[in-house]
UniProtKB/Swiss-Prot annotation:
Keywords: Aminoacyl-tRNA synthetase, ATP-binding, Cytoplasm, Ligase, Metal-binding, Nucleotide-binding, Protein biosynthesis, RNA-binding, tRNA-binding, Zinc. Catalyzes the attachment of alanine to tRNA(Ala) in a two-step reaction: alanine is first activated by ATP to form Ala-AMP and then transferred to the acceptor end of tRNA(Ala). Also edits incorrectly charged Ser-tRNA(Ala) and Gly-tRNA(Ala) via its editing domain. It comes from the Bacteria. The gene is alaS. Binds 1 zinc ion per subunit. Zn(2+) binds at residues 552, 556, 653, 657. It is found in: Cytoplasm. This is Alanine--tRNA ligase. InterPro entries: aa-tRNA-synth_II/BPL/LPL, Ala-tRNA-lgiase_IIc, Ala-tRNA-ligase_IIc_anticod-bd, Ala-tRNA-synth_IIc_core, Ala-tRNA-synth_IIc_N, Ala-tRNA_ligase, Ala_tRNA_ligase_euk/bac, DHHA1_dom. It catalyses: tRNA(Ala) + L-alanine + ATP = L-alanyl-tRNA(Ala) + AMP + diphosphate. Consists of three domains; the N-terminal catalytic domain, the editing domain and the C-terminal C-Ala domain. The editing domain removes incorrectly charged amino acids, while the C-Ala domain, along with tRNA(Ala), serves as a bridge to cooperatively bring together the editing and aminoacylation centers thus stimulating deacylation of misacylated tRNAs. Its EC number is 6.1.1.7. It holds the Pfam family tRNA-synt_2c.
Amino acid sequence: MKSSEVRQKFLEFFETHGHTIVPSSPLVPGNDPTLLFTNAGMVQFKDVFLGQDKRPYVRAASAQRCVRAGGKHNDLENVGYTARHHTFFEMLGNFSFGDYFKRNAIRFAWEFLTDILKIPRERLWITVYAEDDEAADIWLNEVGIDSSRFTRIATQDNFWQMGDTGPCGPCSEIFYDHGPEIPGGPPGTPNADGDRYVEIWNLVFMQYNRDSAGTLHPLPRPSVDTGMGLERISAVMQQVHSNYEIDLFQQLIKAAARATNTTDLSSSSLNVIADHIRACSFLIADGVIPGNEGRGYVLRRIIRRAIRHGYKLGQKQPFFHQLVEDLASVMGQAYPELMEAKTRVSAVLKQEEERFAETLENGMQVLEAALRRGDRMLDGETLFRLYDTFGFPLDLTADIARERGIAIDEAGFDQAMEQQRERARTTSKFIMQEAIAYSGPSTTFHGYESLRQEGQVLAIYKEGSRVEFIEAGDEAVIVLDKTPFYAESGGQVGDSGELLAANGTFAVADTQKIQADVFGHKGLLRSGRLATGDAVLAEVDRAARARTERNHSVTHLMHKALREVLGHHVQQKGSLVDANKTRFDFAHNQPVTDAEIRKVEMLVNAEILANAATEARMMAIEDAKKSGAMMLFGEKYSDEVRVLDIGTSRELCGGTHVKRTGDIGLFKIVAESGVAAGVRRVEAVTGERALTYIQEQELQLQRVAAAVKAQPQDAAARITQILDNVKHLERELGRMKSKLASSQGDDFADRVREIKGVKVLAVCLEEADPKTLREAVDKFKNKFKSCVTVLAAVEDGKVKLIAGVTSDLTARLKAGDLVNFVAQQVGGKGGGRADLAQAGGTVPDSLPAALESVASWVEQHL
C-alpha cells in the first residue's frame, strides 16, 4: 500500500466516524510565536485544548506536516543514518475536544489498524501508563489484547504534559513487532531500545490539569490527542524495516542519485538529501527564508548539510534545487501549496547553493588540513573559523568530524563565539553611551495622550555618574517620574524636545530606555540650573513626532501590502522609523521589481485615502493571537499587549501613531536593496517629504528632457535614440582605429628585425586602444608566421602594452615574461599567456628605450 493510500485511508476512516478533516497548518505556527516549528499534529489545536478557542466541531482529524530540527527536538545528526530519524515527517492524528475519550479513541485506533490496514493482531504490542487502570481494562477486557503483548509503563514516557503546568494525562502507545530477525526487546524491557518493536501510534488522554504545586485536578471535559507517523506506518504496510525504504522516499532517493550521479542507492548521503529536500521545500513554501538566526538559520543548516552530502558524493555543482520538481510530483497532490510555490522554492534553494559554493571548497580544504593533524578533538578555534569565515554550521563540521572518529571542542567554539559577540558589542553604536546604574521609581509614559506633561526630576547623570545638579552647558541624562517623550523601542527612534524648569531649559536630543520602564532624556542644559527634585514641563517636538508617527504608521500598512503583493513568506527582519523616513527589512529572496513596488504604493496610498481611524487596544496575549494580530517570532511579549489597528493592518505595537490613515498624506518608496541573503530593504517617505521627493524627480526629468531637446513624456525615447547613435559612432570609431593601426603596421614593415631567423617588431602605435593593439598583434603574427611582437600606445600619460609570440616559439619565449620585462622599464607590470600578454605603465618617457630593448631580450632567450 502506497504512502498516499495510507494517508487517504486514515482521513476517510475518521471522516466516516464524524471527524472534520482539517488541512495541515503551516510549519510556522501562527498561534505561538515562541515555537520554532510545528512539530506535532496538536499544535494547531493548542488553543482549543487550553480552552482559549472554540471550533465548530468537537472531532477532528488531520495529516500534519511537521519539522523537528533545532531546540528540544534536534535529530539532525542522526538523520540519514538511522531507520526512522527525519527532519520532516507527516503526523496522522485524530482529536476529540471534550467529546469521546479513552474507549472510543482505543477502539478507533484498533479498528483502523486491524480492519482497515489488516495488520495482524499478533504483531501489535500495547503499553499504558502504570496507573491508568481504565485504559488497561479497555485494552485487555474490551479489545481483547493478549496480556503477553501488554505492558504497564511507570515512567514519564507514558504520561504526556504540555508544560510544567496545564493539561496533561496518560498515554497509550501501540508498537509494531518487525520480527525476531531484528534485534531488540518489547517496550518496558532492558532491550526496548532495539529496533524490533517500533512505536507507530500514541494515544494521549488529556484528563488532568496540573497546578503550580504539581497537584493534578480532573478536567471537566477530557480530550484526546493522537499521533501516528505516516512514514512508520507506511513501512509496516510495505513490509520494510527502514522508513527510507518506503515508496515515498525511494522516489526521492532515486532523484537524488540522478542529481548527484550516484549509483549506490544504499548511500546514507542519499537518505540525507531525500529527507532534507522535504524539510527545506516545505519550510520555504511556508515562508521561511535561509538566514543567520531563528528559523532561517535552522533552514540554512539543513540546506548546507544536504549540499555537503552532495559534495561527499562528488557533486560540486548546484543540484539540490533540482529535486523540488521531484518532490512536487510525489507530494504535490496531497499538499497543493507545494505545487503553487515550487518555482519560488527552487529559486531560493539555488541561490543558497550558489552562495555556499563560494566558500565550500576552501572551507573543506581548511577542515581536511585540520583533520589530518591527527588530533582526537577538533579545536574550537578551527570550528569557529569554519563557521565565521566559510559558513559551516557547527553541526555540519561535527558531522564530518564524526565520520573520521574525531570529537569537536564545542565549549571552545562557544567561547570563540562569545568573544566575537563581545567585540561586536564594544564596537557597536550605543546612543546611551554612559553606563547608568539607576535604582528608583519607574517612569510613567503619557505620550500616547499628550505631548506636554508636568513631571519631576528623579535623577541626573553626567558622564555616567549620578549628580545632584547640572549647570548651563552641561550634557546629561535626566530621569523623570512622568514623561510624554517616547523612548526608542520597536524600531521607532526616541523623541526630542525640551524640559522647561523654573531655573533652566534642557534641550532633549534623544530619549532612550535605561531600564524597561525607566526613560533617560539625553541632551544639553541650554541655560540656568537643573537639580534633582525640580519640577519640569516636558514638551515633545511636535513637528518631529508628527513626521515620525506618519512614518511608523505607514510601516504597518507597507508591511501588509508587501505580504499581499509578494506573498505571506514576507516577515519583518528589522526596521528604523524616524522623522525623515521609514526603513523596513523583510524576508524575500529576490529584488522587488518596479511593478511590485508600484503595486505596494497603490495599496498603501489607497489605505491613506480611505482615512480610516487608528485604534489601539490593550488585551491579553492569547486574545491578541486569536484576533489575528501579526506577531514576530522571537519577540518576548508580556501577558498584556497593545494591539494596533490601522487601516486593514493589525499588529502588536507599542509605538506612537497617527489618529487616522489620512494623516499620513502621501507614501512613496524611494529605495530598494538587498542587505543579506534572503533579506531585502525598502526605504520610504511620507507627507511633505514624499511630495518634495516627487517634485525633485519631476524637476530632474524636466532638466533631462531639456538637455535632449524633448518633452518630458518623450525624453526616454529620445535618450534611447541618442544612445543607439552613440553605439553606432563607437563602432565606427573602432573600425577607424583598426584601419589606422593596420595602415601604421604597413608603415612599420621596415622596422621589423630578424634575430636568429625570427621576425621581431617593437613599436608604438598612435591613437590605439587595447582592442586595436590586439588586432594589430594578430595581424603581424598572421603575416610573419614566426615572429615576436610588442606593440605599445600612450593615452593620458599611461602606457598600454601588448606582446605576442607565435605558437612555434612559445616553448622558448613566453609573451608574459616579455611584456613584464618591458613593463618594468615604464613603471608597471603585467603578464598573461605564453602566446599573448598585456601590461601597463606610468612612465611614457621611458617607452622608446624599453621598446628598443626587446630585440636584445629576444636574442638572449632564443
